[in-house]
Structures are given as structure tokens and as C-alpha cells.
């Protein structure tokens, strides 16, 4: 689930393959309505569990943000996501805040 807070979009719950399509679509919706000047921060501090699909969702959001000319950052990624990114060799591509 994604909720808008004062300074970020707060992602909560699991980021697993079962919900990946919905999370991708929800995030894209927020990105499409975002201000180019302000950009978007996805706060992952409330994410409970991840699998490799979480990285796919993040990179999908990033492609959408780039296409729209909106800046995007990821804050507070869970350790499991950082480990998966390192395993797949994509750590440097994560837009960490």
C-alpha cells in the first residue's frame, strides 16, 4: 500500500510478487501527478518483507519518473532489498535518498 505523507510516499506492508502489479500501478499514479520541481520520495521504512520483484517495482517507478521528468528517490530501504540489489549487481542503480 502507498500513502501520501507530508514529505514522501509511504510504502507499507510486503513488497512481494503477489502485489507487485498493484504497487507498480499505484506508484505510477502518484508519479504522474507529482510536481517536476518537487520530485517524489518513496519511504520504504514500513515495508515488512521483500523479494526480487520489489526491485522490479522500484526500477519500473524509476523508468516512469524519468519519462515524466520527475525526480525520484528511495528512502529507508529494508536491508533485504539492499542485499538483493547487491546480489544482482544493481546497487548503484538504486536512487537512494
What are these regions (language model features)?
Residues 1-50, 63-97:
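STAS-like cytosolic regulatory interaction modules
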Amino acid at each position: 500500500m502507498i500513502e501520501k505523507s507530508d514529505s514522501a510516499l509511504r510504502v507499507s506492508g510486503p513488497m512481494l510478487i503477489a502485489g507487485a502489479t498493484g504497487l507498480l500501478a499505484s506508484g505510477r499514479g502518484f508519479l504522474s501527478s507529482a510536481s517536476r520541481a518537487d520530485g517524489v520520495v518513496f519511504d520504504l521504512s514500513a515495508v515488512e518483507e521483500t523479494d526480487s520483484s520489489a526491485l522490479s517495482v522500484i526500477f519500473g517507478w524509476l523508468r516512469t519518473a524519468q519519462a515524466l521528468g520527475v525526480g525520484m528517490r528511495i528512502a529507508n530501504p529494508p536491508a533485504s532489498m539492499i542485499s538483493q540489489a547487491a546480489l544482482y549487481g544493481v546497487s548503484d542503480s538504486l536512487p537512494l535518498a
